[in-house]
Amino acid sequence: MKNRILVVDDEEGIRLLYKEELEEEGYEVALASSGEAALERLDESNIDLVLLDIKMPGIDGVEVLRRIKERWKTLPVVLCTAYPHYKQEFGTWASEAYIVKSSDLRELKEKIREILNR
């Protein structure tokens, strides 16, 4: 059975890039364009890992992370953001990993593999 990854990002180009790259790695990928949509998707689906942007309109990624950890305590979350300074923010510490967005997705793919193989 394929692992299911939920990609949460307000930028469509990022969502589609991650979807294509992760499907090539053999994962099943679901998409959400907002924090609200991500929480709805988690209610409806079995997800094995969440890739979560931090800076989004509406509910930001740090708040989504907090809500995920309240309801789905063991669900791994990888924060993916273009802003490296968020790593120092206390609210991000609950994530399994913190990745700065890059066009090179090797680090992200390696981290996903590592987390899902625990």
Model-found features: residue ranges?
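Charged docking surfaces used in two-component/phosphorelay signaling
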Residues: 16-24
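Helix N-cap/capping motif at the beta->alpha junctions
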Residues: 31-40, 61
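Active-site residues of response regulator receiver
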Residues: 53
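Short amphipathic alpha-helix used as the core "switch/output" element in two-component signaling
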Residues: 40, 62-73
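His-Asp phosphorelay/catalytic-motif detector in bacterial-type signaling
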Residues: 2, 46-48, 72-76
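Alpha4 helix (beta4-alpha4-beta5 surface) of REC/receiver domains from two-component response regulators
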Residues: 63, 83-101, 106-110
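Receiver (REC) domain active-site loop signature in two-component systems and cognate sites
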Residues: 56
